[in-house]
Swiss-Prot record:
Belongs to the arenaviridae Z protein family. Keywords: Host cell membrane, Host cytoplasm, Host membrane, Host-virus interaction, Lipoprotein, Membrane, Metal-binding, Myristate, Viral budding, Viral budding via the host ESCRT complexes, Viral release from host cell, Virion, Zinc, Zinc-finger. It comes from Whitewater Arroyo mammarenavirus (isolate Rat/United States/AV 9310135/1995) (WWAV). This is RING finger protein Z. The gene is Z. Transmembrane segments: none annotated.
Length: 95
């Protein structure tokens, strides 16, 4: 779900990846100074998105996008297109 592109996008881009997409990370590794957290709320540490030099959770990203197209922390343009780095897995189908 969500990993395939529509026919219109395939016709436009072919096999190459559409530009401007940023990866969303489900599990962040430990850094030298501890866990990665959302720079806005400081609570979320899963499902983080990279915004220039810091990370944001989906909730804070949505709230910031409602106000403006620019990040309230760093002033850069907020990311709008997402790509999952690890595709979700499902158990094998057994008939």
């Amino acid at each position: 779900m969500g990993l395939r592109y529509s026919k219109d996008v395939k016709d436009r881009y072919g096999d190459r990846e559409p530009e401007g997409r940023i990866p969303i990370t489900l599990n962040m590794p430990q850094s030298l100074y501890g866990r990665y957290n959302c720079k806005s709320c400081w609570f979320a540490n899963k499902g983080l998105l990279k915004c220039s030099n810091h990370y944001l959770c989906l909730k804070c990203l949505t709230l910031m996008l409602r106000r403006s197209d620019y990040c309230g922390i760093c002033g850069e343009v907020l990311p709008k297109k997402l790509v999952f780095e690890n595709s979700p897995s499902a158990p094998p189908y057994e008939a």
